[in-house]
Amino acid sequence: MRALIVLVLLAVLVMAATCYESHESMESHEYLNPFLNRQRANGFIRDDTGLRAVLQERIRERNKAPQERQREICEDFHLCEQYALNHGYPAAYRHYFGRRRNK
């Protein structure tokens, strides 16, 4: 009889140790509601229109107008940028880069 009581107590202890609901599992919000609503589900999935807009922006970056390329070149050169503040970017580009000399 004593062995049966010890065996039952041991079984209860093993069951309590293995079936315990830890506090970490209760912290998860999925425990109470495992399903997402439509707004949250669509928050991390991009649609085709968003991808198409990104692709168009990349194409526009590659095919820049000549004036925009000249302005960026002038902005990288400090003296040209200072000249552009007084006379404008087209005049500054012509002043510093317009007359290239070939040696």
From Swiss-Prot:
The modification Phosphoserine is found at S22, S25, S28. InterPro entries: GLA-like_dom_SF (IPR035972), GLA_domain (IPR000294), MGP (IPR027118). PROSITE patterns: GLA_1, GLA_2. Residues 1-19 form the signal peptide. The modification 4-carboxyglutamate is found at E21, E57, E61, E68, E72. In 16-day-old embryo, expressed at high level in the sternum and tibia, at low level in skeletal muscle, heart and gizzard. Not present in skin, liver and brain. Disulfide bonds join C74-C80. One of its GO terms (cellular component) is extracellular region. Its main location: secreted. Associates with the organic matrix of bone and cartilage. Thought to act as an inhibitor of bone formation. Belongs to the osteocalcin/matrix Gla protein family. This is Matrix Gla protein. The lineage of its organism: Eukaryota, Metazoa, Chordata, Craniata, Vertebrata.
